[in-house]
UniProtKB/Swiss-Prot annotation:
A UniProt-annotated Pfam family: H2O2_YaaD
Protein name per UniProt: UPF0246 protein PST_1170
Family per similarity comment: Belongs to the UPF0246 family.
Domain of life: Bacteria
């Protein structure tokens, strides 16, 4: 079983990594093409394109300028440890053992606007490029056109390496839309996490993002390997709802008292 999650806007390059293990991103030739496009933009243009403050736009223009295809521990950090934010708060990889990291390396992938698809230990230089950005490029009007079927092809390769065909979608709609389902040789399982609010269960963005990370953490820590085991997930008060679920769409509920 292979999991996919979204990246995060917040990055941490100050905290020392918990491991010396690292791998190189596999698709840097594509990333290089995007960087060359982004280098043509002024800070004001990046601000408009990405809806960023002037300060953040200037920071990211500087990042594009210093980006180099030579990735080392001195200019990059393992992706799983560099990303922060709600999903990664739930994942809490900072206490992973080496065995946890190796399991994650095989069973977890992070979707990325710049890198396409990342393994947990892939070194990553800092960037900001959300998948929904309308960056005109030689392949089309946005990043969905740029990546095309490539991400699906790479997921197929990762699944084939496992000898499996189950893809667990723990990513946002923005990012999972970069996966072309008709090109994917996999059974896709989607998951919803709903919290009680005002008398009914709803998807609340902050809680749902953290819950996706919690499920990824649980799978890694417990070495979960089959879809049949997923209904046992019970971190932080979530419980499986058989009445609301189907074989390929799992629903977990949480009461207000557990939030």
């Amino acid at each position: 079983m292979l999991m996919v999650i979204s990246p995060a806007k917040t990055l941490d390059y100050d905290t020392p990594p918990i491991t010396e293990r690292f791998t190189q991103p596999q698709y840097l030739d594509h990333s290089q093409q995007l960087i060359e496009l982004l280098r043509r933009y002024s800070p004001a243009q990046i601000s408009e394109l990405m809806h960023l403050s002037d300060k953040l736009a200037a920071l990211n223009v500087a990042r594009y300028g210093s980006w180099t295809p030579a990735f080392t521990p001195s200019n990059a950090k393992q992706a799983l440890l560099a990303f922060k934010g709600d999903v990664y708060t739930g994942l809490n990889a900072d206490d992973f053992t080496e065995d946890d990291l190796l399991f994650a390396q095989k069973h977890l992938r992070m979707l990325s606007g710049l890198y396409g698809l990342l393994r947990p230990l892939d070194l990553m230089q800092p960037y900001r490029l959300e998948m929904g950005t309308k960056l005109t490029n030689p392949r089309g009007k946005d990043l969905y056109a740029f990546w095309g079927e490539r991400i699906s092809d790479w997921l197929n390769e990762a699944l084939a390496d496992q000898g499996d065909d189950v893809l667990l979608n723990l990513a946002s709609n923005e990012y999972f839309s970069a996966v072309k389902r008709n090109a994917l040789n996999a059974r896709i399982i989607n998951v919803d996490f709903k919290d009680m609010k005002n008398g009914q269960y709803k998807i609340i963005s902050f809680y749902a993002k953290k819950a996706r990370g919690l499920m990824a953490r649980w799978i890694i820590k417990e070495r979960i390997s089959t879809p049949d085991q997923l209904s046992a997930f019970d971190y932080e008060g979530y419980r499986y709802s058989a009445n609301d679920s189907s074989a390929d769409h799992l629903v977990f509920l949480r009461d207000a008292s557990d939030q």
